[in-house]
Amino acid sequence: MSIADFIGTMDRAGVEIGVLRAGNAIITDILAQYPNRFLGLASISPHDGMRGVRELVRLVQECGFSALRVSALYNMVPASDRRYYPLYAKCVELDIPVRIYTNMNYATDRPYDLGHPRHLDQIAMDFPELRIVAGLSGWPWVNEMVALLRRHPNLYCDTASHRPRYFGVAGSGWEQFLQFGNTLLQDKIMVGLSWEAFGIPMEAVVEEYAALPLKEPVLEKWLYRNAQRFFRLN
């Protein structure tokens, strides 16, 4: 699918801005063509030291990237590893957030808990000003994720890669997430559509969110208001 076709898909679903997760060079090209339709997440190796910090600055200041992306799934370096700390400090200075992979992985050649929410707790304690979004919402450690969202003011989560229609199913493990997401944590949750992973149209995923037992103002927050505030899109 071309980017133009993808934007058409976004338009049909009522999506104004999408988040890009790809190689830095690919994202740079897309942002140059469609700067008002996408947010770019920068991928920087924790092994690159100050070279990586300088590259993050370049991507943000010259190429329009909006956040740092950290994923232990790929490099097997947990997000709380101190090699990431210069990057987190620079994110605070640049006033950009970081999206951290927070989920169990199914790869059999690496530890299953590389993305455990406990790593976020240490980061949030060490960098209280850093805006963090827990990508994939910490499944299957959902209760721990809920507790950490309550504990840290600048910690948020997104629902990418999880089918929304299962959030309300008894025994799914999402019970506390949905309960608190409709009340105390309503300002902390952002929707990730992941429609291609589900094999259904983008607008169908939006409809599944609309069918959840969420209060109307809460649904609006999940769908866009929380992301608008988190990414400073006002």
List the predicted regions and their residue ranges.
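Short alpha-helical
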Residues: 25-26, 140-141, 197-200, 204
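Short acidic active-site motifs
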Residues: 5, 26, 51-55, 141-144, ...
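Conserved, mostly hydrophobic/aromatic
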Residues: 10, 27, 59, 91, ...
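Active-site gating/metal-coordination segments in enzymes
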Residues: 16-17, 24-114
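Short, surface-exposed amphipathic charged segments that create phosphate/polyanion-binding patches used
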Residues: 54-59, 172-174, 234
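N-terminal cationic-hydrophobic initiation segments that often serve targeting/anchoring roles
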Residues: 10, 31-35, 60, 124, ...
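Catalytic pocket-lining loop regions of alpha/beta-barrel enzymes
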Residues: 66-67, 80-190
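Mid-to-C-terminal alpha-helical segments outside catalytic/metal-binding sites
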Residues: 1-13, 17, 185-188, 199-234
